[in-house]
Amino acid sequence: MADHLMLAEGYCLLQVPPHTHGPHAPRTLQPYAGPGMDSGLRPRGAPLGPPPPPGTLAYGSFGSPVSFQPFPVSQSPGAGSTHLQSAATPSPGRIPAPPAAAGGPSPLQPAPGAAASLPPPPPPPALGCMDTELIDEEALTSLELELGLHRVRELPELFLGQSEFDCFSDLGSAPAAGSVSC
């Protein structure tokens, strides 16, 4: 769709004919000429004339194109529109407009007619989803010694074999009368 923009920036889209020696034949690469240069021959500026229509390719020195179609010719009924949809996350410093003010469907809801062709999204992971691979106590003990955590007294929850700790004795204060203990 943006081929004319890429060509204006110095990109050249070439359609390469199929190799005669198979897909794994040795290939030579053209040297990189830098941005704005056409293989060292001449500087490339803005293209002359109007931009090419969408779907046209520059064929370079390979002549006419081979019969290769990278996408299907027929379009779905909703594919005729070429407008861009706004992103769900606004740029920094911009205030997002409410969905009703935009006049279109909400960005979280599919366009009419598109829901039938799309598969349902996968379910979101559970809130308590964690990697459940267990680590033996020997590995944790060696990690504790390697990191020097066996010398740390301020973090009692890191000691191995201790499933919970008494927060009031560890913090050095007694609970107030009528308060809920942790």
From Swiss-Prot:
Kindly list the residue ranges recorded as spanning the membrane.
none
Print the keywords alphabetically: Activator, Cytoplasm, Nucleus, Transcription, Transcription regulation
Spell out the residue ranges making up region: Disordered: 22-129
Classify the source by domain of life: Eukaryota
Q: Name one GO molecular function term.
A: transcription coactivator activity
The main location is: nucleus
Q: Does the keyword Transcription apply?
A: yes
Polar residues bias spans: 64-89
A Pfam match: CITED
Q: Where is this chain's protein located in or outside the cell?
A: Nucleus; Cytoplasm
The reply on keyword Ligase is: no
Q: Where is the composition biased (Low complexity)?
A: 100-117
Quote the tissue specificity entry: Strongly expressed in heart, spleen and testis, and weakly in liver and kidney.
What's an example GO BP annotation here? positive regulation of DNA-templated transcription
Q: Which GO terms describe its cellular component?
A: cytoplasm; nucleus
List the PANTHER family hit by this protein, alphabetically: CBP_P300-INTERACTING TRANSACTIVATOR 4, MELANOCYTE SPECIFIC GENE RELATED CITED
Would you identify the family this protein belongs to, as annotated? Belongs to the CITED family.
Q: How does it assemble?
A: Interacts via its C-terminal region with the CH1 domain of CREBBP and EP300. Interacts with all TFAP2/AP-2 isoforms.
Provide the function of this protein: Acts as a transcriptional coactivator for TFAP2/AP-2. Enhances estrogen-dependent transactivation mediated by estrogen receptors. May function as an inhibitor of transactivation by HIF1A by disrupting HIF1A interaction with CREBBP. May be involved in regulation of gene expression during development and differentiation of blood cells, endothelial cells and mammary epithelial cells.
Please identify the protein, giving its name as recorded: Cbp/p300-interacting transactivator 4
Q: Which organism is it from?
A: Mus musculus
